[in-house]
Regions:
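Short clusters of small/polar residues that mark proteolytic maturation junctions
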Residues: 30, 81, 194-195
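Glycine-rich phosphate-binding loop and adjoining helix at the ATP-binding site
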Residues: 77-167, 212
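A short local loop/turn or secondary-structure capping micro-motif enriched for an aromatic residue
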Residues: 60-62, 85-88, 162, 199-201
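Gly/Thr-rich phosphate-binding beta-strand-loop-beta motif of the actin/hexokinase/Hsp70
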Residues: 36-77, 169-189
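Glycine/GP-enriched mid-protein hinge/lid loop-to-helix segment characteristic of carbohydrate kinases
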Residues: 144-213
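A generic structural signal for well-ordered coil/turn residues at beta-strand boundaries
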Residues: 38, 105-107, 199
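N-terminal helix-turn-helix DNA-binding module of bacterial transcription factors
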Residues: 1-46
Length: 213
């Protein structure tokens, strides 16, 4: 660890002790001795805290929320699709309150936005009641916002291993809204100016409607 981080062995030892005290890492096994005291091995505690993941989507002309709870090792602890009337701040607050009661270790929320954002601020969304909201301030919990198509592209690339097609254009055609896309270049998400890369809805001279897709 000292070699990889450039820190001194003493500093690494101090950090490990702090993580051990917080239960963020746990002692696993003792390594093989080479004559002195056998080295200790540690593993990360993936249940140190949990993540609540929410993203709205359309299916059969209805609006749903995909709601997942995950640990830090990307293991799903819970998942459901819930039909709702509309997407707004109060709905999201209710979901967070409900799931924090069920999963007290939830410390962060991931939100898939059908639109654009600048950090925690949603600048555009297919669900207009979310526009102009700073979710971290409104919800009093750290929120990671990512464009829904960007998230899907990252997941698709990860599932495929990323080596076969390191540069990909991912295009999504939802049922009730114009399409969106995402760009992966050398396995890295390209967001462009003000995170607007992939916003093909606003391409001039193309009238997006269901008759052409």
């Amino acid at each position: 660890l000292a070699k990889e981080t450039g820190l001194t062995s003493a500093t690494v030892g101090t950090i490990l002790n702090e993580l051990l005290e917080k239960n963020e890492i746990v002692e696993a096994n003792h390594g093989k001795s080479t004559g002195g005291r056998p080295p200790k091995e540690y593993s990360y505690n993936f249940d140190f805290f949990h993540c609540l993941i929410i993203f709205p989507f359309e299916k059969n002309n209805n609006t749903y929320l995909n709601i997942c709870v995950s640990n830090l090792g990307e293991t799903y602890l819970y998942s459901e699709e819930r039909k709702i009337e509309k997407v707004n701040l109060q709905i999201i607050k209710n979901i967070i309150k409900e799931f924090k009661e069920k999963f007290p270790k939830i410390e962060v929320v991931g939100f898939g936005n059908a639109g654009t954002n600048q950090g925690d601020l949603i600048t555009f969304s297919d669900y207009s009641e979310l526009e102009g909201l700073n979710l971290s301030k409104e919800l009093s919990i750290p929120v990671v916002i990512e464009n829904d198509v960007n998230s899907a592209a990252i997941g698709f690339n990860k599932r495929k291993g990323g080596s076969e097609n390191p540069s990909t254009v991912y295009i999504f055609f939802p049922e009730s809204y114009p399409p969106g896309s995402a760009l992966l270049i050398d396995n890295k998400l390209y967001k462009g100016f003000r995170n607007c890369a992939g916003e093909i809805t606003n391409i001039k001279h193309i009238l997006w409607n269901k008759n052409i897709y």
